[in-house]
Amino acid sequence: MDDDKYLKGTTTVGVVCTDGIVLASEQRATMGHFIASKTAKKVYQIDDLVGMTTAGSVGDAQQLVRLVSVESQLYKMRRNESMTIKGIATLMSNFLNANRYYPMMVQLLIGGVDKNGPAIYSLDAMGGSIEETRISATGSGSPMAYGVLEDQYKEDIAVKEGLDLAIRAIHNAMKRDSASGENIDVVVITKEAFKRLDPEEVKSRRDSLN
């Protein structure tokens, strides 16, 4: 499989912090060289304290969001407790692997906070699942994003600093990757809440980094 077929047009990042996680993406969607959308959603809420970023086919990604959201809610209704981050990642991994001969053209980050603390898992189109203990990036702009993440990540980073790191990584990727652009969507998940940052706050933080 040619990775370029499903990594085009996206940069998403995940940062594991001491008090939660940060998920972020830019909002450009492309069809070849055509900019199809400037407000594409690539960070989704799939449970109270769990989010997922998507890189790749929009249709495949939206189907997977619906699937995992429903399964997560059904689990909660049956067990009277939320599924763990690892459990959700395993569920998604199994589904992707079962469809490996007709693969979903996606690359995902699933992250949040559960009874075991903050965690992020990265998944490929074949269902391979890796727990990311620090940082992760997906999509065509990920090499540029990793340059910032690897250079500036600290083991004791808090969400407040993780926010700026994620924004800086996406911003840096947008400078060099023509398929990534427009605004930046940022989600912060702590043990208290799932919070999507207001666009004005993101813009203010982004401007202060220049």
Curated annotation (Swiss-Prot):
Component of the proteasome core, a large protease complex with broad specificity involved in protein degradation. It is found in: Cytoplasm. Belongs to the peptidase T1B family. The active site is at T10 (nucleophile). One of its GO terms (biological process) is proteasome-mediated ubiquitin-dependent protein catabolic process. PROSITE patterns: PROTEASOME_BETA_1, PROTEASOME_BETA_2. GO terms for cellular component: cytosol; proteasome core complex, beta-subunit complex. GO terms for molecular function: endopeptidase activity; threonine-type endopeptidase activity. InterPro entries: Ntn_hydrolases_N, Pept_T1A_Psome_bsu_arc, Pept_T1A_subB, Proteasome_bsu_CS, Proteasome_sua/b, Proteasome_suB-type. CDD domains: proteasome_beta_archeal. It comes from the Archaea. Keywords: Autocatalytic cleavage, Cytoplasm, Hydrolase, Protease, Proteasome, Threonine protease, Zymogen. This is Proteasome subunit beta. The 20S proteasome core is composed of 14 alpha and 14 beta subunits that assemble into four stacked heptameric rings, resulting in a barrel-shaped structure. The two inner rings, each composed of seven catalytic beta subunits, are sandwiched by two outer rings, each composed of seven alpha subunits. The catalytic chamber with the active sites is on the inside of the barrel. Has a gated structure, the ends of the cylinder being occluded by the N-termini of the alpha-subunits. Is capped at one or both ends by the proteasome regulatory ATPase, PAN. Its EC number is 3.4.25.1. It comes from Methanosarcina acetivorans (strain ATCC 35395 / DSM 2834 / JCM 12185 / C2A). SUPFAM superfamilies: N-terminal nucleophile aminohydrolases (Ntn hydrolases) (SSF56235). The keyword Hydrolase applies. HAMAP family: Proteasome_B_A (MF_02113_A).
